[in-house]
Amino acid sequence: MKDGILASGLAAGSRIEHNRVSTSAANGILVKCIDKSVVDGNYSFKNKARGILLQRCESAMVADNFVSENAINGIELNIRSNHSSVQGNVCGSNKKSGLRIAGSKGISADGNSFRGN
């Protein structure tokens, strides 16, 4: 499956910012194994899976993104994306949840907007 943006194993603190991703065959943005990563100010919509997915990303930040009309969840943090922050995102009209947190602890979610998920 093809993700719009796949970032995996890059240096800690890597940033994915100000992109427009749509109609990907899988996730719009997938970030794997990048601690302290930042996903900020992106538009991710109409993807076949999730808008934004983080896996094994400790102390990451997902902020000020617009995610909509994705086939699964708008934003998802799973598999030990511990102590991460999700703030100021707009999640609307995703097929399942606007925000899903699974297998992660110490997540802070503030100032997000959810509608019609």
Where are these regions (language model features)?
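Short glycine/acidic-rich loop motifs that flank beta-strands on beta-rich extracellular proteins
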Residues: 1-9, 25-33, 48-56, 71-78, ...
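Short amphipathic alpha-helical surface micro-motifs
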Residues: 11-12, 21, 34-35, 43, ...
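All-beta strand scaffolds that present successive hydrophobic residues in beta-strands
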Residues: 13-17, 37-42, 60-63, 83-87, ...
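Ampipathic, surface-exposed secondary-structure segments
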Residues: 57, 61-92, 104
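Short hairpin/turn module used for nucleic-acid contact or packing/dimerization
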Residues: 80, 96, 100-117
